């Protein structure tokens, strides 16, 4: 409840008289000052609507402020153009590929023989994914607010500060430059197959750009882990009757799964490119292990993003579930004892009272079954099935279609 609210926007419970605005208690049937009737929870019309609208307006206000304060340089630039962001980044990737193709063609080199044609596509798709993932960072705010036990202003400022600090241009550029430099250096360590200096420069720039994009994505993953981990330390309110089977937290889990999926797609592209490129030093044992490590890195990031951010939320969901189960089991036991044929309580019960007790027992057993089925992770079984199918099916298909290439590379 906010200090200026007359009533709760969720259940309508009053804390102030809708007529004279004097504080009231939930057990009062009427205001002692103006005699206004107070049926709790009341149907208070305008006052209830005003409280709900106030909350929605604050959420919308913070969403606008969060969007304006957490737009890194690449998103601001793409947003300023008259086309969709994802389309812009894909066009950039196509132009990079076209430039490399024209340079290679003038020198009699076919880029479709060495997989370098795929670099431009990778750059465009990765930047489109990162742009989308950055926008997704802001979307969980209303859902987080819905399950956190904090006032709107306090939580809004906390969320905005965490996101804007993490997405500062300096931080994003630092990670981009670091990963870009490492990726370009690794390409030369693996062994450049070109002899023409212009083509060497062209492919080095592309290695740097794809590494730069990967650095932006890596920093985004760190932001997700920190933001969600710190959120999990806050007082949270779960609902055992939520239809998602996760106490009302599955939306947050789906957003994390989506970002983990993007990491995985980037990992597939990296693996496909690395395994298809004719590296000069690929058969050297040390270089081969280095290549394996670089291929595995996006998949490690995918799994880290899948498990690490929601660990605190998982712990709180587990405690909530255990507490609810203990309460319901105690109620079930009490009702069983009351309804036992040889109990004094049962002998003294009227028929109507016994029917009520039986109905209560049925309700408690049903609720206990529902709570027992609740997941202690913000992922339901459908989310998990989709995620792991997405992970393993493409790898299996690629291996079945290219067994000789894979075996020759690892051999």
Locate the predicted segments by residue.
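N-terminal soluble segments of membrane proteins
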Residues: 1, 16-18, 46-54, 102, ...
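Cys/His-rich metal-coordination motifs, chiefly Zn-binding "fingers/knuckles"
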Residues: 1-46
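Transmembrane-helix bundle segments that line or gate the permeation/cavity pathway
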Residues: 47-234
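Membrane-proximal, solvent-exposed terminal domains/tails of membrane-associated proteins
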Residues: 50-56, 259, 272-391, 403
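Loop-to-transmembrane boundary segments
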Residues: 71-93, 155-185, 241-269, 347-393
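Juxtamembrane inter-helical linkers in multi-pass membrane proteins
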Residues: 143-159, 227-252, 318-345
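Long, contiguous internal "core" modules enriched in hydrophobic/ aromatic residues
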Residues: 164-167, 172-176, 180, 185-322
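Juxtamembrane boundary at the C-terminal end of a transmembrane helix
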Residues: 398-411
């Amino acid at each position: 409840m906010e200090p200026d609210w007359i009533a709760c926007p969720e259940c309508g419970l009053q804390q102030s008289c809708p007529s004279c605005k004097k504080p009231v208690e939930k057990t009062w049937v009427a205001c002692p000052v103006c005699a206004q009737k107070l049926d709790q929870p009341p149907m208070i019309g305008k006052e209830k609507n005003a409280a709900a609208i106030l909350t929605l307006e604050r959420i919308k206000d913070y969403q606008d402020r969060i969007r304006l304060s957490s737009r890194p340089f690449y998103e601001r630039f793409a947003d300023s153009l008259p086309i969709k962001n994802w389309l812009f980044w894909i066009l950039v990737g196509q132009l990079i590929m076209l430039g490399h193709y024209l340079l290679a063609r003038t020198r009699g080199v076919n880029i479709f023989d060495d997989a370098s044609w795929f670099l431009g596509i990778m750059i465009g798709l990765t930047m489109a994914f990162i742009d989308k993932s950055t926008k997704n960072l802001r979307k969980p705010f209303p859902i987080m607010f819905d399950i956190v036990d904090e006032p709107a202003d306090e939580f809004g400022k906390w969320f905005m500060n965490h996101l804007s600090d993490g997405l500062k241009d300096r931080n994003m550029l630092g990670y981009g430059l670091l990963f870009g430099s490492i990726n370009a250096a690794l390409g030369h360590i693996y062994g450049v197959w070109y002899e023409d200096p212009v083509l060497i420069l062209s492919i080095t720039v592309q290695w740097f750009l794809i590494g730069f994009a990967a650095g932006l994505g890596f920093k985004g993953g760190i932001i997700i882990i920190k933001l969600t981990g710190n959120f999990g330390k806050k007082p949270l309110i779960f609902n055992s009757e939520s239809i998602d089977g996760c106490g009302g937290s599955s939306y947050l889990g789906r957003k994390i799964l989506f970002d983990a999926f993007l990491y995985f797609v980037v990992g597939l592209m990296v693996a496909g490119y690395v395994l298809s490129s004719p590296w000069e030093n690929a058969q050297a044992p040390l270089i081969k292990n280095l290549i394996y490590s670089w291929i595995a890195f996006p998949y490690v990031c995918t799994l880290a993003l899948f498990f690490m951010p929601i660990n605190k939320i998982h712990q709180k969901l587990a405690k909530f579930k255990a507490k609810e189960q203990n309460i319901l089991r105690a109620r079930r036991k009490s009702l069983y004892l009351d309804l036992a044929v040889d109990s004094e309580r049962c002998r003294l019960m009227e028929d109507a009272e016994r029917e009520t007790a039986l109905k209560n027992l049925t309700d408690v057993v049903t609720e206990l079954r529902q709570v027992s089925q609740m997941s202690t992770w913000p992922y339901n079984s459908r989310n998990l099935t989709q995620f792991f199918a997405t992970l393993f099916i493409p790898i299996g298909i690629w291996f079945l279609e290219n067994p000789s290439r894979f075996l020759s590379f690892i051999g």
